[in-house]
């Protein structure tokens, strides 16, 4: 009976260590900056790992009064690029902790 409790306590300590590592990795990821760009670098955006926009830079050549849709499309492309980079790095970083856990 005693061996079973010792194993349970050991397992709980391991889970607490892993939870601490996951929290540290998530905090580090949240502070990491990811840059997304539109074609020809006409628009650049910077997001943090927690999906907060920090910066947007628009090349003056991208501003055309007669074609506002072009600028909108460039912004969307840059944001989507940044979000893909955030998601990719998040999956890579956090995936090592969720591998083998059903539903994760």
UniProtKB/Swiss-Prot annotation:
Biased composition (Low complexity): 8-17
Gene3D superfamilies noted in UniProt: Nucleoid-associated protein YbaB-like domain
Region (Disordered): 1-35
A Pfam family matched in the record: YbaB_DNA_bd
Chief localisation class: cytoplasm
Cellular localisation: Cytoplasm, Nucleoid
Keyword Cytoplasm assigned: yes
Keywords: Cytoplasm, DNA-binding
Segments of skewed composition (Basic and acidic residues): 21-30
Gene Ontology cellular-component annotations: bacterial nucleoid; cytosol
InterPro entries, sorted: YbaB-like_sf (IPR036894), YbaB/EbfC (IPR004401)
DNA-binding keyword on record: yes
GO MF, one example: DNA binding
Family the entry assigns: Belongs to the YbaB/EbfC family.
Quaternary structure (record): Homodimer.
Function: Binds to DNA and alters its conformation. May be involved in regulation of gene expression, nucleoid organization and DNA protection.
NCBIfam families: DNA_YbaB_EbfC
Identification of the protein by name: Nucleoid-associated protein PEPE_1483
Biological source species: Pediococcus pentosaceus (strain ATCC 25745 / CCUG 21536 / LMG 10740 / 183-1w)
